[in-house]
């Protein structure tokens, strides 16, 4: 059963925001010192009452380093499976807008690596939302948080099983938020997911979002990939 937004909406009184980690690098470094990826844990008495999620989710972080392979830059930060643990994690890491240029966050179902080559992603694609640079301060964190709450709260009707994860790319030339799905050929499913995504993020009709196939992105020769679906769809005459 989907979790309503009211159940997953941020409650400041039940999440300790004192002494948050100043940088995501610190969160990653603290996990590097443990044998296994840590599980986020809420610290308040109220958190003893847990609200389980339908899936376990893993947060990944990437800080680009030209001297390292891409996979070596990718770190799994934490795994969680309750609403409370999500907020404990979210409140103690940097917001997307606070990340350095070239950094990414990935939130994927546990067991799915945030890369095109993963068997769960190889036939899939992504809904891509480009953040208006002039409205970055208002939109980036809003888009990212709304997307996170939507996927962990199973807000995509009966299509939750088709969703793999979410990504935010922080770039000086323009930030991007994306939602990855499992099968790029399921046009009806992906269209409905995109419609829900656009509504959740409150993106106006004047700003289209596009669905791109991973394989097309991996072999592109220019900066743009021809989308498989665009919302709103252009009228045919």
Give the positions of each predicted feature.
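Eukaryotic intrinsically disordered and solvent-exposed regulatory patches
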Residues: 43-46, 112-116, 152, 161-166
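Extended catalytic/binding region for NAD+/ADP-ribose chemistry, centered on the ART fold
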Residues: 71-96, 129
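Long, polar low-complexity intrinsically disordered regions
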Residues: 1-44, 48-54, 201-204, 216-237
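Short, structured protein-protein interaction patches enriched in aromatics and acidic/basic residues
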Residues: 102-119, 167-172, 176
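Short glycine-/aliphatic-rich beta-strand segments at the starts of folded cytosolic domains
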Residues: 123-133
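Intrinsically disordered, low-complexity, Lys/Arg-biased terminal tails
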Residues: 5, 136, 140, 144-237
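Short aromatic-glycine-(Arg/Gly/Cys) micro-motifs in beta-strand/loop hairpins
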Residues: 50-71
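Eukaryote-biased feature marking scaffold/signaling PDZ-domain proteins and nuclear chromatin regulators
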Residues: 52-54, 72, 81-84, 102-103, ...
């Amino acid at each position: 059963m989907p979790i309503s937004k009211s159940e997953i909406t941020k409650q400041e009184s039940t999440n300790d925001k004192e002494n948050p980690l100043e940088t995501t690098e610190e969160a990653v470094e603290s996990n590097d010192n443990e044998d296994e990826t840590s599980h986020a844990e809420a610290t308040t008495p109220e958190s003893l009452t847990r609200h389980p999620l339908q899936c376990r989710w893993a947060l990944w972080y990437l800080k680009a380093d030209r001297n390292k392979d891409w996979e070596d830059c990718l770190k799994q930060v934490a795994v969680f499976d309750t609403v409370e643990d999500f907020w404990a994690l979210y409140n103690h890491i940097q917001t997307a807008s606070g990340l350095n240029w070239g950094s990414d966050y990935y939130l994927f179902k546990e067991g799915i690596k945030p890369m095109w080559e993963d068997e769960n992603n190889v036939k899939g694609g992504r809904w891509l939302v480009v953040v208006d640079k002039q409205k970055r301060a208002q939109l980036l964190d809003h888009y990212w948080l709304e997307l996170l709450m939507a996927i962990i709260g199973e807000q995509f009707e009966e299509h939750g099983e088709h969703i793999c994860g979410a990504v935010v790319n922080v770039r000086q030339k323009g930030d991007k938020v994306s939602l990855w799905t499992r099968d790029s050929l399921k046009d009806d499913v992906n269209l409905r997911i995109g419609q829900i995504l656009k509504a959740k993020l409150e993106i106006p009709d004047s700003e289209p979002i596009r669905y791109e196939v991973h394989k097309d992105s991996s072999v592109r020769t220019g900066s743009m990939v021809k989308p498989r679906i665009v919302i709103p769809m252009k009228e045919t005459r």
